[in-house]
Amino acid sequence: MTITIKSDNVTTGGTLGNVNGLKDQDYTLLLDFQNGEYTKKVGGVITNLTEADVLTCTSNKTLATKPMTMDRLGNKLYITKTDQTRWWQVKNAFGDFFGLLIESEQVNWFLNSATPITQTISNIPAGSTMVASCIGTGSITITGEGINPVTVTQDTPATITPQSLSTTISLTVTVTGTLSHVQVVRCAGFAGVHSPITTTTSRPTSGFDKVEINQALIAPLLAGTQQLTILIQSVPLQHTKDDRSQYNETRVVLETTALVAGLGLNKAANTNIGSRIVSTYKSDGSSHVSSGTVAISAQLNAPVTQVFSVGDFGFKGSVNGGNVYAVANATGLNNVTRIRLAEGVAAPSVMQGGNCVITKLAVFKKQLSDQEIKEFSKSWL
């Protein structure tokens, strides 16, 4: 007699013998935010960890703006502490994602956002590119001098790019139908929807998310490490079409005794993406290196897996299985003491902080060949 066993479950991103989706199992630290599973591997021994073991949160969110977090069932909850870790679920054409929510500080320029009525927004600073979004069954129509009129619904947020960027901006936002929230936010990094920022008759800043891998965890794991590779997957809440020629966001910030380096993602108006690195000297804040590329074809709102490899060879990166981008003079990133998640890097080598959901992250204490880097960056896709 022959017995056939069938399963209704379909595995993605790996085989049954490789259920975590990694292209290489020789990792030191694996943080699967999607499934809430965290492990370290020392001497071949795997140890399970908790969220408290792996993350340190020093966020400074403004509770008056009613910042939200989300559970794995998609339920939205208001946070109760300014330094609370936030989570978010994203469902789009590419899948169902869940992970750590990181957003930079923003202002919602639309007043009384939870009881929206038609209004004019004045004195938006020059040089602003904005994203308008709303929640509900109605819509908003945005008009103003120097912009192309646009109508926005819950499913169709839009980028607003003033034709003249040298003067302050005024917008008229006309509300139609039933809406529970309206938002007009200036872009920081990529053009995309920010989680809801509630306003009243004033518009306080949202505050920022600031999360890093627990230093007490990585200190013994990375002590004396000369070659380090970080693998990370991120997905946006919802990007909108953006005609700016090129822009960027961090995904990881590495810190050594001498340097702070932002490793992130470049994006172009044609939606091409690529690796980026900027780093500064801690002693005087001067630039160490600033370099990037946008050579990889990508689709708007698709998940992105990136490999960042640093060592005596400098920096090497790959995105979604694309060609390796190398920066030979980006040396000195040995003996990493901190790994911060999607935090901004200040002048002179600026990289905007990330606005994204980080679903997975893995750390490897070894140098990879170019072919391995390309293969690693196909993980979880």
PLM feature spans:
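Extracellular polysaccharide-targeting segments
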Residues: 2-117, 174-225, 359-381
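A carbohydrate-recognition surface predominantly in extracellular/luminal proteins
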Residues: 128-134, 219-239, 245-250, 302, ...
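Short strand-turn-strand beta-turns centered on an Asx-Gly dipeptide
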Residues: 143-145, 318-323
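Extracellular carbohydrate recognition and processing domains
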Residues: 144-170
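Short, aromatic/His-centered strand-loop micro-motif at the edge of beta-sheets
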Residues: 147-152, 158, 279-305
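Flexible glycan-contacting loops in extracellular carbohydrate-active proteins
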Residues: 168, 326-358
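Glycan-recognition/cleft segments
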Residues: 250-278
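Short tryptophan-centered beta-strand motifs in secreted/extracellular beta-sheet-rich domains
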Residues: 301-317
